[in-house]
Amino acid sequence: LDPLMRVGPQADGHRKPRPTERRRGLFRRLGLPEEAERLYPFQLSGGMARRVLVSTALITDARLVIADEPTPGMSLDQALEALTMFREMADQGRGVVLITHDIDLAVAFADRVAVFYAGTTVETLPASDFQTGPQALRHPYTKALWRALPQNGFTPIPGFQPYAGSLPPGCLFAPRCPHRTPECEMAPPPARELRGGEVRCIHAT
């Protein structure tokens, strides 16, 4: 947000005529008080600022919205409302890319999920596979994430992600993988299609 502009005009953008009523409706849905439109960014809490930013994305007719961690600082109800609005955009045929560490929220609202490890996509899958359980997942890291969720036993993943400057030569997850073989450490595995998704693991079946 521009620190020198009030947040109402920022959310409206350069559209003419100004979509004031539409923006006020979005503010209400996101739990922002009416007077928020007259405030400057420094007068907002972190959660309020994120809700203003969400409204700037929703007020447009953009064909693609990329939302990077849009919900931290929001209450659960506010986060659910924001994600419901993104879901409505997707149902209208627009693209929404949600970047988040909150697996439960992502799985609840997404059509497909891409799992990253050390900056690389290790698996893409239908969100419903994550809800099914580890037998529907493909990559050992994705399965480890599933087991690390509180409702699935909160089992930690041993070890640490590699630093960007010291990546292993083969599979990035191999040093932490209980199923690794010497082949895993020879070269990065290519992405391949498997059971309606894509995976970077030579042993995935």
Language model: regions and residue ranges:
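Short catalytic/signature loops enriched in Gly
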Residues: 126-205
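ABC transporter nucleotide-binding domains
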Residues: 1-136, 205
